[in-house]
């Protein structure tokens, strides 16, 4: 019988929307996660705060319409238990057929 060592460790590079969601999903599945983000050391023109899950603009989450790519993706993320979608819905601002959030409140909710 061969013994196997299973390591439950993941390093996620980037603390943007995708990186934060990936890290959270991995933790929920029992992995030990290290999340590395460069903005705390070096900022770019797009970074305002250096915080995790920082959005470029308040409507970055786009359309809610079920026949648009953004609407389809949001439904898929919700079915997967997305942390980011749960946070976005908690602080959503009324904006018609677009999911708009207060960027600073969103970042705090994710963190």
Placement of each model-derived feature along the sequence:
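Feature captures the FAD/FMN-dependent oxidoreductase FAD-binding
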Residues: 76-111
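Short alpha-helical segments and helix-capping/turn motifs at coil-helix boundaries
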Residues: 17-20, 108
């Amino acid at each position: 019988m061969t013994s196997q060592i299973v390591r439950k460790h993941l390093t996620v590079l980037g603390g943007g929307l995708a990186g934060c969601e990936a890290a959270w999903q991995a933790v929920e599945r029992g992995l030990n996660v290290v999340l590395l983000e460069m903005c705390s050391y070096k900022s770019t023109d797009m970074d305002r705060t250096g915080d995790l899950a920082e959005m470029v603009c308040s409507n970055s989450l786009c359309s809610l319409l079920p026949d648009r790519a953004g609407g389809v993706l949001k439904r898929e993320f919700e079915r997967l238990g997305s942390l980011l979608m749960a946070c976005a819905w908690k602080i959503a601002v009324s904006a018609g057929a677009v999911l708009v959030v207060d960027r600073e409140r969103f970042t705090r909710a994710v963190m």
